Amino acid sequence: MSMMLSNWALSPRYVGQRNLIHCTTLFHTLTRWAKDADDKYHDINSMYENMFTPSNDNVSILQDEGKSDYDTTKASSMEEDISAFNKDLYNFYNIGYAKQIMSASQLENIVKAKGRFVIQSLSTSPYYNLALENYVFKNTPRAKRGPDNCRLLFYINDRCAVIGKNQNLWQEVDLAKLKSKNFELLRRFSGGGTVLHDLGNVNYSYLTSREKFETKFFNKMIIKWLNSLNPELRLDLNERGDIIQDGFKISGSAYKIAGGKAYHHATMLLNADLEQFSGLLEPSLPNNMEWESSGVHSVKSKIKNVGIITPNQFIAVVSERFQKTFKVDGEIPIYYCDEFKSINDEIKDAMNTLQSEQWKYFSGPKFSVKIKDKGLTIKVEKGMIYDCDRNDLIGLEFKGFLENIDSYT
């Protein structure tokens, strides 16, 4: 399958022929270190191997030019080569030299001012990223006249399961499996169903005014942009507004509307470890339990990775098309954040909320559960049993009850 998105990848700077050969020894040393690295560095390792390994033609050219005295086993400017290598590596993975990370005050000034922009978080902390998204949404001013202040946010989270604000987590996830596979559990500030994140999934959040908001709008734009670059992707939209490919769901969405503003945030499965996702959204509860809840229930769907687009390519393509499509007066800038520098008390407070057991386990909708073979009905609100056929269970935490259900029943 041809790769039509390669021009949109984040490319390292040009290195001349002589420097290519100078880097040969350096590269082969560094790739020994890279073998034990995370799989996400596979693409960059391959790219640099092609870049730094001279062909016979290159060596011949240099020799013909009177440079036959060059010894490929020695690097004349090792410090410069290491610096160049690191700079390119950091640029490619958005974690260094080329990315000017905003300070807390810069973030506040930019978010609270009118205007359109793109923000990419360089953090993989789901707590920071959801708190950052919440901060941008709450502090974006409503445009009283002229163009609305539409904004686009990207972030990639480490392993986590994210349930909707109005979901009963006990019906959505297997807590024991999440723990065994080192997945964090989060309850987000918006509605919608449960999704799984890892480093092969990109999250995007499109913010606009309430008047301009339409649930399927931005996903239609993404489909248009990506299909135009590579028609072999064959991306489409289902009736729920999810992006699909060959009948498989590759992107799930959730929405929030408040204060005259709205946002649509969604996942994009690019090269996620889907094997690790297996079973995480299948609660292992006794078969004798019958649930009644007013909360939102996730819709089960077959999922797959897009496969031929990397996270960096996706972010680069969508950012560039967003800049062109939504440009009004002047260029739309791209800013960068992380949890060490681009953080303030409001973001910290939101992170503390997201991390708290109170928010995770003791919020969400009211529900009741009937244990059929015991003739027992339990009613729960804010994580606490408030009504039951047995008085000794009233006032217990439902989490503790479920963890020790055999001793209670």
Curated annotation (Swiss-Prot):
Reaction(s) catalysed (UniProt annotation): L-lysyl-[lipoyl-carrier protein] + (R)-lipoate + ATP = N(6)-[(R)-lipoyl]-L-lysyl-[lipoyl-carrier protein] + AMP + diphosphate + H(+)
Keywords linked to the UniProt accession: ATP-binding, Ligase, Nucleotide-binding
Boundaries of every BPL/LPL catalytic domain copy: 146-330
Functional pathway: Protein modification; protein lipoylation via exogenous pathway; protein N(6)-(lipoyl)lysine from lipoate: step 1/2; Protein modification; protein lipoylation via exogenous pathway; protein N(6)-(lipoyl)lysine from lipoate: step 2/2
Gene Ontology biological process terms in this record: protein modification process
Class in the EC hierarchy, top level: ligase
Binding site for ATP: R188, G193, T194, V195, L196, K249
Enzyme Commission code(s) on record: 6.3.1.20
Binding-site positions, (R)-lipoate: K249
One Gene Ontology cellular component annotation held by this UniProt entry: cytoplasm
Superkingdom: Eukaryota
UniProt-recorded Gene Ontology molecular function terms: ATP binding; lipoate-protein ligase activity; lipoyltransferase activity
SUPFAM superfamilies: Class II aaRS and biotin synthetases
NCBIfam families per record: lipoyltrans
Job of this protein: Catalyzes both the ATP-dependent activation of exogenously supplied lipoate to lipoyl-AMP and the transfer of the activated lipoyl onto the lipoyl domains of lipoate-dependent enzymes.
Other noteworthy facts: In the transfer reaction, the free carboxyl group of lipoic acid is attached via an amide linkage to the epsilon-amino group of a specific lysine residue of lipoyl domains of lipoate-dependent enzymes.
Record's subunit section: Monomer.
Family, as annotated: Belongs to the LplA family.
Protein name (record): Putative lipoate-protein ligase A
Species the sequence originates in: Saccharomyces cerevisiae (strain ATCC 204508 / S288c) (Baker's yeast)
